[in-house]
């Protein structure tokens, strides 16, 4: 293999730049040229493709976001549109593609593979919801951002003796809510994978109040429902002074943590190794702190699951 491409797609996540850097440097180490595809699959279709050198990725490892920019591209679901993308890759002499992103990005890589172009997926999303890996690039940084925010909110919740409902990202996956809630001692954690009883939430808050607790933190993944509605329900049912904070896109930004930088470097380099070995149609991951790779079609057929033991622990510790 003489030339490969790399793109980032979908929602950005801290550590994507570290992965790009690893792809470029690993490939050049093996005398392979690397071309960056800007704005994800949209840039692939339009031909926004440029050669990357060692200097192209200098000093990007501590930066959040993605040097290659990113975008969502719904038209890439069309086979004819994907053929245009493949034509652009062949036009530039690119023989393999590294795709950094989440579930939608993997779907695009899978479709390209099925149409005969070798791709390797690298899991980049703060949601930590990609099958075949224990952790995704950006999750640890987002988690620390959320924990820092909750710490600050708890300070003011304590001062004003208030209940706070804090909404975090996670439309379909509750990892951020679960890990952050457990790490911060939240009184209640609501995630889309687990049904909840609002009466039970209310009863839990009242029990805390009866034993003298003056404030509470409830962490809600966005996929559960409206945090504002949950906050209103709590205030009406308890008469507790209740506030709602939606953390939003701050969770996607910031300099990546050491863990995300190292993870991204390992996964990006491994993706290049797979392409060199002629193993397209794969996705890389980390399991039990060891690098792994899976057939991307098989990986996408799996469903991300929450850590049931951790969820149970969070309930037991928040009595």
Curated annotation (Swiss-Prot):
Annotated GO MF terms: 6-phosphofructokinase activity; ATP binding; fructose-6-phosphate binding; metal ion binding
Binding site for Mg(2+): 103
InterPro entries: ATP_PFK, ATP_PFK_prok-type, PFKA_ATP_prok, Phosphofructokinase_CS, Phosphofructokinase_dom, PKF_sf
GO BP: canonical glycolysis; fructose 1,6-bisphosphate metabolic process; fructose 6-phosphate metabolic process
Localization annotation: Cytoplasm
Pathway as given in its UniProt record: Carbohydrate degradation; glycolysis; D-glyceraldehyde 3-phosphate and glycerone phosphate from D-glucose: step 3/4
Predominant localisation class: cytoplasm
Keywords: Allosteric enzyme, ATP-binding, Cytoplasm, Glycolysis, Kinase, Magnesium, Metal-binding, Nucleotide-binding, Transferase
Residues annotated to bind ADP: 21-25, 154, 185-187, 211, 213-215
Cofactor (UniProt): Mg(2+)
Enzyme Commission number(s) from the entry: 2.7.1.11
Gene3D superfamilies: 3.40.50.450, Phosphofructokinase domain
Notes on how activity is controlled: Allosterically activated by ADP and other diphosphonucleosides, and allosterically inhibited by phosphoenolpyruvate.
Record: residues binding substrate: 125-127, 162, 169-171, 222, 243, 249-252
Residues binding ATP, per UniProt: 11, 72-73, 102-105
Domain of life: Bacteria
UniProt KW Transferase keyword: yes
SUPFAM superfamilies reported in the protein's UniProt record: Phosphofructokinase (SSF53784)
Active site: 127 (proton acceptor)
UniProt family annotation: Belongs to the phosphofructokinase type A (PFKA) family. ATP-dependent PFK group I subfamily. Prokaryotic clade 'B1' sub-subfamily.
Subunit record text: Homotetramer.
Function of the protein: Catalyzes the phosphorylation of D-fructose 6-phosphate to fructose 1,6-bisphosphate by ATP, the first committing step of glycolysis.
Protein name (Swiss-Prot/TrEMBL): ATP-dependent 6-phosphofructokinase
Organism: Bacillus cereus (strain ATCC 14579 / DSM 31 / CCUG 7414 / JCM 2152 / NBRC 15305 / NCIMB 9373 / NCTC 2599 / NRRL B-3711)
Gene that encodes it: pfkA
């Amino acid at each position: 293999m003489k030339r490969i491409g790399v793109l980032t797609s979908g929602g950005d996540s801290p550590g994507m730049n570290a992965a790009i850097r690893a792809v470029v440097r690993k490939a050049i180490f093996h005398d392979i040229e690397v071309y960056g595809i800007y704005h994800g699959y949209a840039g692939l279709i339009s031909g926004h493709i440029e050669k990357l050198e060692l200097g192209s990725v200098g000093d990007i490892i501590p930066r959040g976001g993605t040097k290659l920019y990113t975008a969502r591209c719904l038209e890439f679901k069309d086979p004819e549109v994907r053929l245009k993308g493949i034509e652009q890759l062949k036009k530039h002499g690119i023989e393999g593609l590294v795709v950094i992103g989440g579930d939608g990005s993997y779907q695009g890589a899978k479709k390209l593979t099925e149409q005969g172009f070798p791709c390797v997926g690298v899991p980049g999303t703060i949601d930590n919801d990609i099958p075949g890996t224990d952790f995704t690039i950006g999750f640890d940084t987002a988690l620390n951002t959320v924990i820092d925010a909750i710490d600050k909110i708890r300070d003011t919740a304590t001062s004003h003796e208030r209940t706070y409902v804090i909404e975090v990202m996670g439309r379909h996956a509750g990892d951020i809510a679960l890990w952050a809630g457990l790490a911060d001692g939240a009184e209640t954690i609501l995630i889309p994978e687990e049904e909840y009883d609002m009466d039970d939430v209310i009863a839990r808050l009242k029990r805390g109040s009866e034993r003298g607790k003056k404030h509470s933190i409830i962490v809600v993944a966005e996929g559960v429902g409206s945090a504002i509605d949950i906050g209103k329900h709590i205030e009406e049912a308890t008469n507790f002074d209740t506030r709602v904070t939606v953390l939003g896109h701050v969770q996607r930004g910031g300099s990546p943590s050491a863990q995300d930088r190292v993870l991204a470097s390992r996964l990006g380099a491994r993706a290049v190794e797979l392409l060199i070995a002629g193993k397209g149609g794969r996705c890389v991951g980390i399991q039990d702190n060891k690098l792994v790779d899976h057939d991307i079609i098989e990986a996408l057929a799996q469903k991300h699951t929450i850590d049931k033991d951790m969820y149970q622990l969070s309930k037991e510790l928040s009595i």
